[in-house]
Amino acid sequence: IGCTGTLDGTQTHRLVLEGLFGPVLQVTTTKDLMDDKQIADLKIKCLVLKHSEEICKASRKWDYDTEIEYIVMNAARNKFITNLALSLEGNTLVLYQFVEKHGKPLYEMISPRCGERKSFLIYGKTDVEDREEVRALTEQEQNAIIVASYGTFSTGINIRNLHNIIFASPSKSRVRNLQSIGRGLRLGDNKKEATLFDIADDMRTGKYTNFTLQHFVERVKIYEEEKL
């Protein structure tokens, strides 16, 4: 028997699994688990940032990597994420993709303004023991901010006391997005709901739609398919 909460949505992946284990049987859905109060209720807030006309025109000539580079190193965007994280009540997880270009700069913007709130930076080189310590501390906190890479905190971390998730970096992976959402669905003693903030970047001009906005549209389709 093979069990998973997240197929990647491709026909090839499904056929490979069926070849190994037999027909795929979906025994429940995220929405059904929410309705049965087995997991926390989830609210999704999509925040679309409109970029300047000059940037929109320039982005037409960019490849995907150039667009990502611009997004994660955009000072105004990072300030927006910082202000958002600091404005939220409850424990907040800020997920990013690139450590040096995005994760560390975000943490350096957030941490000095936390006051008495605890803040943590987690990435691939963070010791497993330190990650577990952060997880344990967060369970006892009510207003901490964790700035963590997708690779370290999108899967395998069980934090029941997590109230907010911010997608600070764009991601086109169905599995990564759903598994990241799963971090916020655990029920806690004082937690019955969680909120996901999905940040997108609108650089459309004429008939052109930028790469990461296309990926955002795909994420919205996933949310609709999962009835989130």
What function would you assign to each model-found segment?
Residues 1, 91, 141-145:
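Loop/turn-to-beta-strand initiation segments
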Residues 1-45, 223:
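Post-DEXD/H (motif II) to motif III coupling segment of the RecA-like Helicase ATP-binding lobe
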Residues 3, 93-97, 122, 168, ...:
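Short hydrophobic segments within beta-strands
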Residues 3-7, 97-99, 148-151:
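A short beta-strand-to-loop transition that corresponds to the Sensor-1 phosphate-sensing loop
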Residues 13, 21-24, 40-43, 115-118, ...:
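Short glycine-/polar-rich loops that comprise or flank the Walker A/P-loop
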Residues 57-97, 101-112:
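Conserved interdomain hinge at the start of the Helicase C-terminal
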Residues 93, 107, 111-132:
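Conserved RecA-like helicase motor-core motifs
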Residues 124-225:
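Conserved RecA-like P-loop NTPase helicase motor core
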